C-alpha cells in the first residue's frame, strides 16, 4: 500500500478543494497497460471515498510533454483532492490493505476476485513515485471543471525569495485574471508544497497550474498587461522581480484521461 503512505490538489480540478496530494509516476518500460489496469482498480476505491465524503475528487493525467532533458520524466500524474490536511490524514489513518481490498471487491461486484485484485495492485509497474502534498495559495476566478481530454500546464517552482508568493499574487495573478476575463485562459492556480515523500524532489517549493483554451494564447507583454501597473517601464521592472523571485525547475503539459468527483 505504498500509495497510501504519502499522497496531492486542483480545481474542481482545485477549486473546491484546498488541499491535495499529487503523485508523479515513471512507469517501467512496457508496463503502461498494467499501470492503467492498476488505476482502474484504484478508481473504485476513490469512488467509494468520494461517495462517503472523505475526499473531493480524483483525477488521472497522462504526461504529454516535459522540459526535462536529463533523467526520467514522469509518464502519469494523479491528483487526490481533500477539504483539509486533517481530512486527508483521517481517511488514510483509518485505512489498511484488507479494508482496501474489501472496498474494491464490493464495488466490482464479482467481476474481479480478491486474488486478481491483489495481483493487479501489487504488480511492480512503477519505476519511481514522486508525491507532494500541496495547498492552494492563490487562483483565478471563477472556479472551473476540466473535461476529460483537456490539457493543463504544470510548472515546478523553486522559491528564491521569502515573499515569492506575494509576487505571484500581486503581479502575476492580476494579469492572469485579466486573461481569464478576456476569454484567453480558462484557469490559473498557485500551490505550495507542504509535504512530500522520500523520492520527491526536495528543491520544489511550489507548483503553478494553467488550463489553456484551445486556439488562445497568453500574452504577458501586451499593452493591457502593462497598463495594469502604470505602463511599460514599471511593468518591465516588476516582471523582472517576479522572474528573480523563483526558478522554474521543470514544466509539463498533461492531458486529463480519467476523473471522478
Regions found by a protein language model. Give the residues of each.
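Sec-dependent N-terminal signal peptides
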Residues: 2-16
Amino acid at each position: 500500500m505504498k500509495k497510501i503512505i504519502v499522497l496531492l490538489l486542483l480545481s474542481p480540478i482545485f477549486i473546491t478543494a484546498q488541499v491535495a496530494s499529487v503523485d508523479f509516476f515513471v512507469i517501467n518500460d512496457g508496463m503502461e497497460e498494467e499501470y492503467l489496469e492498476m488505476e482502474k482498480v484504484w478508481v473504485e476505491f476513490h469512488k467509494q471515498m468520494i461517495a462517503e465524503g472523505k475526499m473531493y475528487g480524483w483525477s488521472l493525467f497522462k504526461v504529454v510533454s516535459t522540459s526535462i532533458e536529463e533523467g526520467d520524466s514522469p509518464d502519469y500524474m494523479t491528483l487526490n483532492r481533500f477539504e483539509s490536511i486533517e481530512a486527508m490524514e483521517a481517511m488514510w489513518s483509518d485505512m489498511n490493505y484488507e479494508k482496501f481490498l474489501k472496498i474494491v471487491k464490493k464495488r466490482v461486484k464479482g467481476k474481479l476476485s480478491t486474488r486478481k485484485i491483489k495481483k493487479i495492485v501489487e504488480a511492480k509497474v512503477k519505476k519511481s513515485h514522486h508525491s507532494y502534498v500541496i495547498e492552494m495559495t492563490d487562483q483565478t476566478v471563477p472556479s472551473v471543471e476540466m473535461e476529460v481530454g483537456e490539457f493543463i500546464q504544470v510548472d515546478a517552482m523553486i522559491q528564491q525569495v521569502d515573499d515569492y508568493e506575494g509576487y505571484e499574487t500581486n503581479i502575476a495573478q492580476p494579469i492572469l485574471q485579466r486573461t481569464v476575463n478576456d476569454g484567453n485562459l480558462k484557469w490559473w492556480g498557485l500551490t505550495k508544497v507542504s509535504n512530500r515523500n522520500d523520492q520527491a524532489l526536495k528543491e520544489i517549493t511550489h507548483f503553478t497550474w494553467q488550463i489553456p483554451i484551445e486556439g488562445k494564447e497568453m500574452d504577458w507583454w501586451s499593452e493591457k498587461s502593462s497598463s495594469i501597473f502604470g505602463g511599460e517601464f514599471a511593468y518591465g521592472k516588476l516582471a523582472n522581480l517576479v522572474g528573480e523571485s523563483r526558478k522554474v525547475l521543470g514544466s509539463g503539459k498533461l492531458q486529463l484521461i480519467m476523473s471522478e468527483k
